[in-house]
């Protein structure tokens, strides 16, 4: 298969700004060494055939040794009909066509080191890989533009179906590295040029997430609360956190919406402290871990997206030397991570596996 084109892109951890990208706020994300890969081979017909690692392989550290794949066929000469509102492979093809890209037939074989449905942006990373693979396949210059790839991926995964997600996952995967993403005026990415000497340790709770319902339960009441507060001149979470708006106005909300809005205000303040910290020199590990865990506590207590299993993992890790940690992704299950001294990593893993 000498004419095959290979592409890959990483998953990410969200350090700060979880559940805030869809509010038009900032996030800090870091790419990790779990990747989605695609191998693209041209065909002589109008069929795009995607073979993707079987969704049964949905846990960390499971290799596709038996070659288990699911296959999806799309004839681009015909109208594309979605099987569901999560038919992201066909929506990616359809969005590219609607944007005017001249696609042709391809075989695309996809593999992933990323567990599916666990808060590791597997669907976003997959869509980014498909977009890049198809653009590379047709030799389009946009294949070299990570911003363009990320926007197309967002349109295919979120906008096409009216889903409630934000843009962090697509941009973090397409751009990679340690980055501060801002969404207030379009999308801006600011690389953070520093190394982090500690170890990020990722854990799978083995609990399957219901991403759309979790997002709806956290995003919708926050937006509803902010809409109510507009009547009092409040322009958004950033206005309440740093812009001079009277925070006591939040008391005009019912308890449910009030709790969501207050958690987002505090998490925005934590994000700003985190960005300032990451741009400092010197040893920041302990303070960084504490801020990450403070962020998690707002996600747990304010947005209600943690689980008993994830709390048990984080408690055990911190008791055995981790600086801090948090749930990763939309929540309600899936993965969490801790930031820890490298010399403590093995012990932390051993103790959690005991439980």
List where the protein language model places each region.
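FabD-like malonyl-/acyl-CoA
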Residues: 125, 336-339
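C-terminal nucleotide
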Residues: 2-16, 37-86, 95-98, 102, ...
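Gly/Ser-rich oxyanion-binding loop with an adjacent helix/lid
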Residues: 1-13, 21-22, 82-194, 319, ...
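Glycine-rich phosphate-binding loops that contact phosphosugars or nucleotide phosphates
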Residues: 333
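Structural signature of FAD isoalloxazine-binding scaffolds in flavoprotein oxidoreductases
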Residues: 24-44
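Short acidic-hydrophobic sequence patches enriched in Asp/Glu that either
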Residues: 30, 126, 145-149, 163, ...
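A generic structural signal for short coil/turn motifs at secondary-structure boundaries
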Residues: 24-26, 116-120, 209-213, 300-301
């Amino acid at each position: 298969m000498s004419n095959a084109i290979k592409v890959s892109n990483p998953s990410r951890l969200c350090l700060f700004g979880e559940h805030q990208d869809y509010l038009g706020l900032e996030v800090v994300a870091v790419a990790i060494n779990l990747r989605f890969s695609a191998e693209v081979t041209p065909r002589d017909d109008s069929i795009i055939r995607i073979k993707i690692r079987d969704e049964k392989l949905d846990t960390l550290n499971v290799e596709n040794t038996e070659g288990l794949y699911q296959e999806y066929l799309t004839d681009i000469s015909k109208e594309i009909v979605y099987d569901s509102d999560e038919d992201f492979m066909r929506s990616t093809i359809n969005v590219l066509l609607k944007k005017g890209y001249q696609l042709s037939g391809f075989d695309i074989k996809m593999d992933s080191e990323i567990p599916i449905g666990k808060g590791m942006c597997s669907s976003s990373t997959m869509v980014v890989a498909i977009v890049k693979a198809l653009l590379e396949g047709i030799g389009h210059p946009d294949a070299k533009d990570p911003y363009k790839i990320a926007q197309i991926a967002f349109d295919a995964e979120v906008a096409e179906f009216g889903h409630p997600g934000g843009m962090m996952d697509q941009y973090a995967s397409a751009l990679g590295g340690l980055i501060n993403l801002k969404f207030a005026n379009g999308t801006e990415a600011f690389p953070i040029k520093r190394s982090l000497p500690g170890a990020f340790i990722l854990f799978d709770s083995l609990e399957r997430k219901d991403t759309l319902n979790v997002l709806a339960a956290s995003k919708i009441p926050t937006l509803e609360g902010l809409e109510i507060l507009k009547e009092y001149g409040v322009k958004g979470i950033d206005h309440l956190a740093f812009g001079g708006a009277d925070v006591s106005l939040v008391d005009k909300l019912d308890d449910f919406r009030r709790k969501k809005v207050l958690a987002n205000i505090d998490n925005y303040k934590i994000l700003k402290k985190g960005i300032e910290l990451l741009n400092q020199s010197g040893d920041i590990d302990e303070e960084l871990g504490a801020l990450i865990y403070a962020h998690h506590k707002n996600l747990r207590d304010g947005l209600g997206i943690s689980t008993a299993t994830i709390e048990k993992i984080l408690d055990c890790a911190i008791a055995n030397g981790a600086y801090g940690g948090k749930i990763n992704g939309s929540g309600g299950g899936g993965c969490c991570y801790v930031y820890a001294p490298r010399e403590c990593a093995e012990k932390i893993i051993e103790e959690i596996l005991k439980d």
